[in-house]
Amino acid sequence: MDKRPAVIFAAIIFLLLLSGCMQKTDAAAAGETAKATFTVTGYQGKIAEKAVEAEKGANAFELMKKNISVKYTLYSFGPLITEIEGTKPEGSDYWALYVNGKYAEKGIADYILDEDLEIEWKIEKSPY
């Protein structure tokens, strides 16, 4: 009796079981989380502070919209924040974005939560 079909069948079953284990590992990795801490500083000092735990890969702007009252205008380059927690900058002042203590080099919509982030919005004077 030829045992080849039984060996091939056993190998296929083994590979299917092995691929099932790999999927569980990927699913566990997808459940990893990171923390985004949003701090908002206006003319009179701190307006709001909120820490949010979310899955890695979450968009910082989407998290902000869900957890802090924010108004914005959407442009081709991304959202321009106009009001946070009911506070609007006066005159030519603007909302400045700092991420992990440094002035942001990109917009809030371009930050992805792949590690813990400290996100701070401050009203600053325009240099113009």
Question: What kind of region is each of these model predictions?
Answer:
Residues D2-Y128:
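Ubiquitin-like/PB1-type beta-grasp interaction modules and other compact soluble beta-rich domains
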